[in-house]
Amino acid sequence: MQSIRRCVLTISFFLLSSTFPVLSPAKTVPALAVLSRIKSKVKAGYSKKMIEGFNGQMLLRRYRVRTEKKGRATIFFNDGSEVRLFGETELTIGAKKSRNYRWVRYRLFLHTGSFWGHFVRGKNPVEIGGGGMRLQLSDASLRFSRGKTGIDIAVPSGMAKVSNKSSSVKLLAGQRLYQVRKNDFLPQKISLIPNQLKLWIEPSAPVFKGKESLKLNLHFQIVRYGTDRPVDRPGSVYLKSNYYNLKIPDSIRLNKDGKAKTTIEVAPPRSNDRTFEGTVTLHSIMDQSGYNDVQDGLLKVRFTSH
């Protein structure tokens, strides 16, 4: 079981990454992000000096992160944004900005593979490039895949501006571009994301009794979007939450029917926590490439005290 302590992670990030020493003692370089929640082997560093990655590793601008076939890794950025890399993926963070777009917050470049990301609202957007595509987004989530046959882009929430050599479009929440190339006319390629990862919990109205933790059954099912019609599809699931006193399994996998059931343990908030208002948000994504046709699962659970 892995304890999700987002506030602790945030504090640790700023304590550790406010400055990162380089060779000259008179000069420091701020870290852009931190590596976390690694599965299998991951490498990180400058392109010609990559080393085996580890949880808590500080990532500087121009660093690359590369996952092996069964590898996964989460990158937490210092602005609060988050990226989840899937297997056989290579991404540059803080990549060099083009002359006409120096005003963007920072730039990511996908060399190969696939990732999911959520980018928080900011004064300037984040830019993402790869395969002849340029994306700009803020306060939005997306899945981005680059393969030999084309590019897949899906926007589960928010809005993303996408452009290539011949055209540009605004992808709204629930829309995607499937197998597009740098010379395609993008407005003709827009379609809806057809499926969704649905979540529900038992009991549906949990109650804290004193200081005792609760063990709850959490269910997953891929369904046709807008319906409860099941979709038979196996795959790995990545689960996260905005609550610090929550334990979840390290691994969740849907069976061939597209279903899964797991147990999560939720403890009451700390006695001195005056910010907790009783609602815990659970957010799940398909944790591998090839699932750009499945929208994120989102569940808000209301807890009461007895």
PLM regions and their residue ranges:
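Flexible, surface-exposed loop/linker segments and immediately adjacent secondary-structure boundaries
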Residues: 26-193
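Short beta-strand segments of immunoglobulin-like
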Residues: 202-209
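Beta-strand-rich structural segments
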Residues: 211-228
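Short flexible loop/turn segments that cap and initiate beta-strands
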Residues: 223-248, 276-278, 295-296
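Aromatic sugar-binding surface patches on proteins
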Residues: 256-263
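Short, surface-exposed loop/turn segments at beta-strand-coil junctions that are enriched for proline
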Residues: 267-273
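Enriched for extracellular/lumenal, surface-exposed ectodomains of secreted and cell-surface proteins
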Residues: 278-294
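Short beta-strand elements
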Residues: 290-306
